[in-house]
Amino acid sequence: VRRILWKNKMDINNLGRQLYRQAQRHKGFSTLFSVNTLAGINSNNNNVYQALINENLGRTPVGLLGQYHFWKSDITIHRCSDWMASLRMASDRVIGTESGTDNVKGYYLADGALYTYVDGEEYTDIFPCWDWRKVPGVTCYQEDKRVHVMGWLEKQNKGSFVGNVNDGNVGMTSMELVRDGLYAKKAWIFTPDYVLCLGADIHSDSSYLVNTSIEQALLKEKLLHLEKGKWNAVKDVCFSADKPERFFHHQTGYIVLDGKGRAFSEKRTGLWNDIMKIYPKSEQVTQNIYTLYFDHGTFPQDASYQYMVLPASSLEQVRRFDLSSFKVNAARKSKVDDNTAKMQSIKQLGV
């Protein structure tokens, strides 16, 4: 359980269907209380229990670093000393999420949802104000109608090629998305410095727009866009595949390598009742949110995307990031080798 906590908050991908107010913080504290109880029952593991408690209360540096894949849940966790990433998928073996009177809008929560955490407050109580068709990392249709409410045992993905390979520090996760007439090959490469996200062979049989969300999180500062070597605040900007585009917010950078789309921020108001029916319909919440996404158009055929997320970075680090050879360390360099229907790969020299 230590892997899914970050700064005493539980990762969204591991909240299950209970996306209630302050769920991340409450479930984080609940875990610490349970661990403290275990310490009184089994003193042989006191060091392990205390390490989890100390880390999440900020008494000690983050531990249990590296990458781990929960293959029975189709979830990848990547932990570094100053940031964490979590990826959730579904397959023909794994039901990725469920609903009922909880998680009413969570239809796409297991279609490649990628969250990155630095201070742990990136998505706090964002759920009533989310565009649930732009969950970070997800490729899906953009419809005007209400998101479908799932049942308890509803399969979400017919794809079987879903999994991960890693050496404990770096790794690659892949997902074949086959759902509702939409097909995509999605891949994520996790390193100590960034997450490289690839999408290929995206096609659908529907006239609905298809988007891939890069990010949708709380706006804490101005959203910045690098233009002619200078960072400028933007509220709404479109980007194309003509050249790489760099964005920055708070402590995280985003570099779009391939694909056209939009980056914008706005104020939204939503209802907690739309997420969990236990809340009254009068209970509104307003949040400032920023969003980055790719627009693949209608009836896409062989569409693709490439982007990088650089958590726990600075403006200067994102501005200077060398795209001709992604920096893994001083001795090793890598580049995107392929991102097609036949192969998605990254070549790392010196391995």
What feature does the model see in each segment?
Residues 2-351:
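Extended polysaccharide-engagement surfaces of secreted carbohydrate-active enzymes
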